[in-house]
Design a protein with these regions (language model features):
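PLP-dependent amino-acid enzyme catalytic core
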Residues: 1-354
Length: 354
């Protein structure tokens, strides 16, 4: 990269995005997230693999959703909208509320009661969004907001909004720009299924323009209790500790299937136990704290290595979609509890076992 300050994904990749010179860019300087080598993760699974972690939790609101939201909000402002609406398992609501605040728009978000991590809910609230907790699932909330957007002067900013995926594809551009090539495999958690579709779109556009010579195989991971694509059926009551991917009827289901099939990839499932084990492993082996949905990718890596699905010497990129601070409760439940000690040197040394 040059010494010029990072301008946000729209300005950085303007040539690849549906914007004009008159589009009012609403940005929090999202993007430019680190691609972190993970040698200890490789050592713990298959030492011949080159593993990199695309840490999207370092975006302004702590998740990959910011990439799509800068586009969705910018285009909403361009169209004259004064309000936006979304359904969310948490991260979309946080991003929508923040970017709407940045643009001076009203934001309305609907979340399933009891299914949104505290960190995400607090973000939407502090940014001034009107938050409604629905007595139902995410899929029911999405159906409601879609109907509202069809009949009222408010812009829908879920991933069914085509500008969302346009923004999210920039993560694939960054992977190539940082790695110097496309990976052999790209592993990603799948909830509403927009992100795996967006990455594939980005890789294909770079390939079309000769910026990469090969394309990765896209591998998606769903939680076992919320795996509609894997099971090829709508899950009426999805269940998983990974609330960000607790979705039973993904809006981008068809696009995700195309991405997987066209890239010769596949979709697999991981259990909550595997997710939480990988969640702790990622934090303790690589020093990276990401939310449980992100750990689905690491759990999938472990499972697929054991199954022999990756050729030795392959390069893998794993997308970690959101920061661990999004869901502090799960972290505290999964970690070693703090120990109380008297304020004395001997008591402290007795606990440290040095």
């Amino acid at each position: 990269m040059s010494d010029v300050a990072w301008p946000g994904v729209i300005e950085r990749y303007r040539h690849y995005l549906p914007v004009t010179d008159t589009t009012p860019v609403v940005t929090l300087l999202e993007g430019n997230t680190p691609l972190v080598p993970a040698p200890r993760l490789a050592e713990a699974t298959d030492g011949s693999l080159s593993i990199f972690l695309k840490c999207e939790g370092f975006n302004p609101t702590g998740s990959f959703k910011d990439r799509g939201m800068t586009m969705a909000i910018s285009k909403a402002v361009e169209a004259g909208s004064r309000a936006v609406i979304c359904a969310s398992t948490g991260n979309t609501s946080a991003a929508a509320a923040a970017f709407a605040a940045r643009a001076g728009l009203r934001a309305f978000v609907m979340v399933p009661r009891g299914s949104v991590a505290l960190g995400k809910l607090s973000q939407a609230a502090i940014h001034g969004a009107k938050v409604l907790m629905v007595e139902g699932t995410f899929d029911q909330a999405l159906d409601i907001v879609r109907r509202i957007a069809e009949s009222h002067p408010v812009t829908l900013v879920n991933s069914v909004n085509p500008f969302r995926l346009e923004g999210q594809k920039t993560a694939a551009f960054e992977v190539v720009d940082q790695l110097g090539r496309a990976p052999d495999y790209h592993l990603i958690p799948v909830g509403n299924a927009g992100n795996i579709s967006a990455y594939w779109r980005g890789y294909r556009e770079y390939h079309r323009d000769g910026k990469i010579q090969s394309l990765p195989r896209m591998v998606g991971f769903q939680a076992a209790g919320a795996a509609p694509i894997y099971e090829n059926r709508v899950i009426e009551e999805p269940r998983t500790v990974a609330t960000a991917i607790k979705i039973g009827n993904p809006a981008s289901w068809g696009l995700a299937l195309e991405a997987v099939q066209d890239s010769r990839g596949w979709v697999e499932i991981v259990t909550d136990e595997e997710i939480l084990r990988a969640y702790r492993m990622l934090a303790r082996e690589e020093g990276i704290f990401m939310e449980p949905a992100s750990a689905a990718t690491v759990a999938g890596l472990v499972k697929m290595v054991k199954a022999g699905r990756f050729e030795r010497g392959s390069t893998l990129v794993l997308t970690l979609t959101g920061h661990g601070l999004k869901d502090p409760d799960t972290a505290l439940e999964s970690a070693t509890r703090p120990t109380s000690v008297p304020a004395s040197l001997d008591a402290v040394l007795g606990q440290l076992a040095l």
